[in-house]
Amino acid sequence: MKEIPITSFDNIQIGQAENTAGGTGCTVVLLGKDGAPAGLDVRGGGPASRESELLKPLAAAQVIHAIVLAGGSAFGLDAAGGVMRYLEERGIGFDVGVTKVPLVCQSDLFDLTVADARTRPDAAMAYAACVNAETGNYRDGNHGAGTGATVGKLLGMEHCMKSGIGSYAVQVGDLKVGALVAVNAVGDVYDFETGRKVAGLRADDGKTFLDSERVLMRQLDAPQEKFVGNTTLGILFTNAKLDKARLCKAAGMAHDGYARAIRPVHTSMDGDSIYAVSLGDVPADLDAVGVIGARVMAKAIVRAVEAADSAYGFPAARDM
């Protein structure tokens, strides 16, 4: 098993755009002129998404043409319109006779409390991300959907840390499996291989870590206003030949990577979602893809927080 760049998969282009001052951005994954099969598994209690019904195994469409990860919560769902315009201009989409309709799925995270709540990803920003995808401007850290991402928010934003977007991919023989993830969790992030806490909830001194799970358990009977602005958004890529049903299962198995790296995870305060996309025709066992997928997803989560820089008054892991 060797590490490879997330950009080494065929038939994808990844572009990002952001409004740094406004504290938000979007990441667009274009899936080629013919699109690609995809599945989705949502485990969090508060998702903001678009066209997710397309990815159910019984839905008619067998491929989609792009995936958008963005900030802005439900407001940011406007961004997909820019991707649709970009693809329509290039004749990419589902042929309905009179035109071609691009099938664009999107999931958003909540970053409205980071900088300017009135600044959200829109069609113009997503169109710019598509243009950037032509040359490939993907970077881990405070970019794209990770621009306003934070973690460790159980006690409010004054106790959280800066996060971002991260990636990790491997190759085993001919099989490639990779993950891209924007980490905006209410919980803490751990290196699952060492048990070390990388980023998360900070004590009042701003320097000491608290354990979010222990804090939550102590508040079991205490009245509280739960902070609802969270969500970790991931995409699992593989060149294995998988249909929608199997991709939905692979996405579900990749959620194990969330559980390894984020504590607590899949709460009512999160909208945790994972897409899975098939980008090739390599024969591979579904369970093998899922096991590798969970591993690369956990590694990508750690990379997202380690690559982040302090911003908007929130310290990053490298500052602790």
Description of each model-found segment:
Residues 1-320:
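Alpha/propeptide regions of enzymes that mature by internal proteolysis
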